[in-house]
């Protein structure tokens, strides 16, 4: 009980400072479990505690800008997992509804093997999870064994183990009762990749993030309530350098998002970023020393790379595509603090200009088709492939590309999926299972027309992310 309250205080303090938070409730007794062999009665289960966190996060604000945010993770084998799936729904007992938290579901290899073998209970829980993702966008799906089986050997020296991810499902760092993860993130603009690929940009960005860790330690050391995060940062100095503008870069080269060419570029670019980031951490290790969890490695940092969603940062970078995901449409309405604005894909616009087809009726057709160019006769088949929208892209190809990228990321990546409303359940299941088989550590939101409509009715931001994940 004390630890649950202590962590809720930590959550509030971190949210107030602009950080997203996440906690794993898998070790809490399920409802009806005896407390101290029944001497103290029976447990009320996890939902009342999650409800407490739900209320606390509502009262916590990230500066003066917006309320705080937290993700609660739960292993699918926990007895209360079916109830956990329902807590964000506006139905049932009010005291068991939690509309302000985000959900993450944890799946082991053993569980997933039983899903593939179509075993009863596991298969039912998995399908219930997918149905909820189609309806609400959540829970995030975390494949915990994919995360832990690729950690370096030197993690094991300190018994470091990953238990859960973060609010945006790209962070994979070790935690325990005395250590809470810290996200230290920034992103490289891949839309400008050709301008910085032969410079020391990656090297300097890695040094910059390490300096941010130093500043955090200096400012946070005397703040009550976040001692576990300070302790974690001191021992790990973990970083998460990522990217944004990936789809914009591909379109600038007239390369389709799906296919071998995009996968080859993924390997080339992220392999290069990893190599240069490794050089930077070894340089800092030799110059400034290694933290406790990196002793004997010569490194300055426990981790180096993680790809965040970067929704707001992508706007600030000139309206490039978010993170590593495809553009949702080639024309869309952007709702920001200054009002509503119609945004057009600049690469498509340049192509239409070159063809003498940058006409109002063309853009009206694209708008009518929800951002799609597939009915624009003046574009060739190859050009239409380049400007496929998120939902038009084969989601299996998106997962395969992410698997290539994951080889170079020591943490993870925020990977959203998008399906048309009439997508067969079998296809949605296949894509999710393939993500696990290919080694992805997690999947973020599932975007569909149904969950966008449902969330609009509840007046809640479906794609919440913390300030750190906008780095």
Predicted regions and their residues:
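Glycine-rich phosphate/pyrophosphate-binding loops
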Residues: 17-29, 69-72, 256-259, 415, ...
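Function-dense linear segments that define catalytic or interfacial modules
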Residues: 1-38, 46-49, 60, 133-233, ...
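Catalytic alpha/beta core of large soluble enzyme barrels
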Residues: 162-163, 168-175, 217-219, 305-471
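Internal maturation/activation junctions in enzymes
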Residues: 204-230, 234, 253-310, 381-384, ...
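Generic recognition of flexible, low-complexity loop/linker segments
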Residues: 11, 60, 128-131, 172, ...
């Amino acid at each position: 009980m004390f630890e649950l309250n202590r962590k809720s205080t930590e959550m509030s303090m971190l949210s107030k400072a602009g950080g997203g938070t996440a906690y794993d409730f898998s070790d809490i007794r399920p409802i009806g479990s005896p407390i101290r062999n029944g001497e103290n009665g029976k447990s009320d289960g996890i939902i009342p505690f999650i409800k407490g966190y739900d209320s606390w996060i509502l009262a916590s604000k990230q500066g003066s800008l917006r309320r705080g945010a937290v993700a609660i993770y739960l292993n699918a084998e926990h007895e209360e997992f079916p109830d956990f799936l329902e807590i964000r729904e506006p139905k049932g007992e009010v005291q068991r509804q939690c509309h302000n938290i985000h959900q993450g579901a944890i799946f082991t290899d053993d569980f997933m093997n039983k899903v593939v073998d179509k075993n009863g209970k596991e298969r039912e829980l998995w399908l219930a999870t997918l149905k909820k993702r189609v309806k609400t966008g959540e829970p995030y799906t975390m494949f915990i064994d994919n995360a832990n089986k690729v950690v370096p050997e030197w993690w094991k020296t300190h018994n470091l183990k990953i238990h859960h991810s973060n609010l945006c499902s790209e962070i994979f760092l070790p935690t325990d009762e005395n250590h809470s993860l810290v996200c230290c993130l920034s992103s490289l603009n891949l839309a400008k990749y050709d301008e910085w690929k032969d410079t020391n940009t990656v090297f300097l960005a890695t040094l910059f993030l390490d300096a941010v860790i130093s500043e955090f330690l200096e400012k946070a050391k005397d703040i009550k309530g976040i001692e576990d995060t300070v302790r974690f940062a001191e021992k790990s100095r973990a970083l998460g350098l990522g990217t944004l503008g990936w789809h914009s870069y591909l379109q600038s080269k007239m390369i389709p998002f799906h296919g071998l060419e995009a996968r080859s570029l993924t390997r080339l670019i992220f392999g290069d970023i990893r190599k240069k980031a490794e050089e930077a951490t070894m340089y800092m290790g030799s110059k400034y020393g290694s933290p406790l969890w990196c002793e004997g490695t010569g490194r300055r940092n426990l981790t180096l790379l993680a790809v965040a969603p970067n929704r707001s940062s992508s706007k600030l970078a000139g309206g490039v595509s978010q993170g590593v995901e495809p553009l949702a449409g080639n024309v869309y309405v952007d709702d920001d603090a200054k009002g509503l604005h119609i945004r057009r894909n600049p690469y498509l616009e340049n192509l239409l200009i070159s063809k003498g087809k940058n006409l109002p009726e063309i853009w009206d057709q694209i708008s009518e088709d929800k951002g799609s160019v597939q009915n624009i006769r003046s574009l060739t088949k190859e050009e239409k492939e380049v400007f496929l929208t998120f939902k038009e892209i084969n989601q299996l190809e998106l997962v395969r590309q992410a698997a290539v990228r994951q080889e170079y990321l020591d943490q993870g990546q925020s990977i959203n999926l998008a399906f048309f409303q009439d997508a067969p359940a079998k296809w949605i299941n296949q894509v999710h299972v393939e993500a696990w088989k290919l080694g992805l550590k997690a999947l973020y939101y599932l975007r569909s027309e149904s969950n966008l409509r449902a969330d609009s009715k509840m007046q809640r931001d479906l794609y919440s992310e913390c300030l750190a994940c906008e780095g």
